[in-house]
Amino acid sequence: MILFILLVGTLLLMIGIPTIARSQERIIKIDGSSTVYPITEAVAEEFQKMKKGAVKVTVGISGTGGGFKKFSRGETDISDASRPIVKKEIDACKEIGIEYIELPVAYDGLAVMVNPKNNWVTSMTVAELKKIWEPAAERKITKWNQVNPAWPDVPLKLYGPGVDSGTFDYFTEAIVGKSRSSRGDFTASEDDNVLVQGIASDRGGLGFFGYAYYAENPDKLKLVAIDGGKGPILPSEKTVMDGTYNPLSRPIFIYVNKKSSERPEVKEFIEFYLKNAPTLVKQVKYIPLPEKAYKLASERFSKRVTGTVFGGEAKIGMKIEDLLKLEEKK
């Protein structure tokens, strides 16, 4: 009988050990933009190595809009965003009392790409892109020669981020003139690698997503120069930073739940993020902000300054110096 009691006690103790371990495990939950994902994932990997398993960081992809939905329900600590938070998302956070800290982490250019076998396009105007992507084009503009008569009678197959994507929001506002205003007959995915494969396998394919994904796949895609009114410009670190790649250059962000930031592991993660961003951003083919911008972001985080400097709107074609001015005013 004594032996039986000892065995039962030992089993209960063994069963309890994982429960205790789980209760002590520290987890940071992140979700949102597929564009910002490579940066945050790189930071998370390095941070977890440093912490030697003491902190787990999960990084999901549901698009900027999808990420903000989770963030505004209190399901995540940090939200990756490829555009500033908009009014309906601000209101959703207010509804349940979520305060957030807005931190720019890098600069990105939206790249427009075609299949490498496309030998008729090297550049496109904003007007031509609008003609392709505006809602009125749905099931009507289906061949390249309908966009420009100098181009061949080849089927036009379109690829782009889904409607929960901040990249979709930004592109439609910059090109069509209204956020989320787009034809619906295109292959959409929150996974940019799916879009890469689609364009790469279709001679008449055209699509758009963050420049970093092109930089990872230059042999599979052909980059298109964009004419915003001052001649065709290709996206590059230089043209994005100096603002000449217009209107498809933009800052990208993380948003931190203020309450979550009071947890030591979240505080340490954000400090690590901002300190290491200049190096890690470059490693994953994005464009780092100036040192001054990271310093301002670090100051904002240390003071727990909440809210957005963008007033609930996207700022199309914003230059780095414009971003710095907004940061300094906050």
Describe each region flagged by the PLM.
Residues 4-16:
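Bacterial N-terminal signal peptides
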Residues 22-330:
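Flexible loop/hinge segments at secondary-structure junctions
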Residues 16-22:
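A short, compositionally biased domain-edge/stem linker segment
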